[in-house]
Amino acid sequence: MNDKAKSILDIRQILGLLPHRYPFLLVDRVLDYTPGECITAVKNVTMNEPFFQGHFPDVPVMPGVLIMEALAQAGGILVVKSTDTSVEGKLFLFTGMERVRFRKPVYPGDRLELHCRLLRHKLKLWKMEGKAYVDGQLAAEAEMTAAVMNREDM
């Protein structure tokens, strides 16, 4: 592989990288990533999502906090693919979000494209810029900070 190792990850591979499971796994596919730099992933939003039962029954809109979680999960995959460390016994935890903006509602049937770019990494902390798009239009954005922790230290 060259310096810009481009790959595609399907749901089976994602399940091996993230601890999340239904109904909280919010990344369906990774379209592209460059270790230590960036990732592009997808969440296909369907009317079958459990959160649409109450948010909102007559006008279903994906909750903004779940858009942020989808970005965080994409960022978690980027972190895992950017280190030589095994994911066994590790958790990727949000430690902060800044400059959060919701620009466009996300509806059932939308394909949420998740872009994360690594800004910096120091010890166990990772800072990323995340942007979520629907049909090429910015739906949400944030700067996110996360930590990689050992499960036994929790």
Swiss-Prot record:
InterPro entries: FabA_FabZ (IPR013114), FabZ (IPR010084), HotDog_dom_sf (IPR029069). It is found in: Cytoplasm. Keywords: Cytoplasm, Lipid A biosynthesis, Lipid biosynthesis, Lipid metabolism, Lyase. GO terms for biological process: fatty acid biosynthetic process; lipid A biosynthetic process. It catalyses: a (3R)-hydroxyacyl-[ACP] = a (2E)-enoyl-[ACP] + H2O. Pfam families: FabA. It comes from the Bacteria. GO terms for cellular component: cytoplasm; membrane. This is 3-hydroxyacyl-[acyl-carrier-protein] dehydratase FabZ. It comes from Oleidesulfovibrio alaskensis (strain ATCC BAA-1058 / DSM 17464 / G20). The gene is fabZ.
